[in-house]
């Protein structure tokens, strides 16, 4: 499966510690194996899926879009607080 990333996603990953990146990698592997694992959003974020996972003690969300059967676009990762508000600002 082909994985595309946005600049917003890259910036967020750059700030993570090694253990946090390991937990993010595990979540990405889960999504690649099961693209339907995330919760489908409606309204302004139609077409976006959000996958919830733990990064240490923190509940985090990973927003992604399945472009076709073979391509996955990772949009944003971060803590739950104000996540959807920030996602609306970055995603047209």
Can you annotate each of these PLM segments?
Residues 2, 55-61, 65-92:
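Enriched for short, Lys/Arg-rich terminal
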Residues 16, 28-31, 90-91:
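Alpha-helix boundary/capping residues
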Residues 1-27:
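Arg/Lys-rich, positively charged N-terminal/basic patches that mediate binding to nucleic acids
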């Amino acid at each position: 499966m082909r994985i595309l990333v946005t600049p917003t996603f890259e910036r967020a990953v750059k700030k993570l510690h090694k253990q946090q990146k390991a937990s993010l990698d595990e979540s990405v592997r889960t999504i690649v194996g099961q693209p339907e694992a995330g919760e489908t959003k409606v309204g302004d974020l139609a077409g976006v899926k959000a996958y919830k996972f733990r990064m240490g003690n923190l509940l985090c969300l990973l927003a992604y879009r399945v472009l076709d059967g073979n391509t996955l676009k990772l949009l944003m990762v971060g803590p739950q607080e104000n996540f959807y508000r920030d996602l609306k600002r970055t995603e047209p």
